[in-house]
Regions:
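Small beta-barrel nucleic-acid-binding modules, primarily SNase/OB-fold domains
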Residues: 2-165
Length: 165
């Protein structure tokens, strides 16, 4: 069963170590459907009828549901933004990196909307709802996330303006 789930996510690395492009064509075939948004960087999807929790690789949104911790600045806004990008029923293309799962058992993925090819992880950073979170060996888009976050910070976008203290 796990093999089927992992096979549904495509690995962007080739034998030469290169990665795929970051914006995918709108005609890309979906391999997952949104069931819910848990918070700004975690979603629930179905893959071939099996429900999975997915952690968006390379980004970190402020916490809203971490046990014994207060809701962080801009956490509710980040969750709402992700929910607006990914309404229930949205077709997705999930792309994996080196590791399939995080220590909490969540599937790790770069997430694309198939309707328009939007790279969701990157859009969340670009709009100031997340900071980059680089955890090796899952680093295929790390430089892009860092550069995008710098631009959002320079423009005082989202959390970069609201959470300065």
């Amino acid at each position: 069963m796990v093999g089927l789930l992992l096979a549904a996510c495509t690995n962007p690395r080739t034998s030469a170590g290169t990665t795929s492009v970051t914006t995918l064509p709108g005609a890309l075939a979906p391999n997952a459907v949104v069931l819910y948004v848990s918070d700004g960087d975690t979603i629930g999807v179905t893959i071939d009828g099996v429900e999975e929790r997915v952690r968006l690789i390379g980004i970190d949104t402020p916490e809203t549901k971490k046990p014994d911790n207060p809701v962080e600045c801009f956490g509710p806004e980040a969750s709402a933004f992700t929910a607006a990008l990914l309404p229930v029923g949205t077709d997705l293309y999930l792309e994996r990196d080196v590791e399939a799962r995080d220590p909490y058992g969540r599937l790790l993925a770069y997430v694309y909307r198939t309707s328009d090819g939007m790279f969701v992880n990157l859009e969340i950073v670009a709009q100031g709802f997340a900071r980059p979170l680089t955890i090796a060996p899952n680093v295929a888009h790390a430089d892009q996330f860092v550069a995008t976050a710098r631009a959002a910070d320079a423009a005082a976008t989202g959390l970069w303006a609201a959470c300065t203290g």
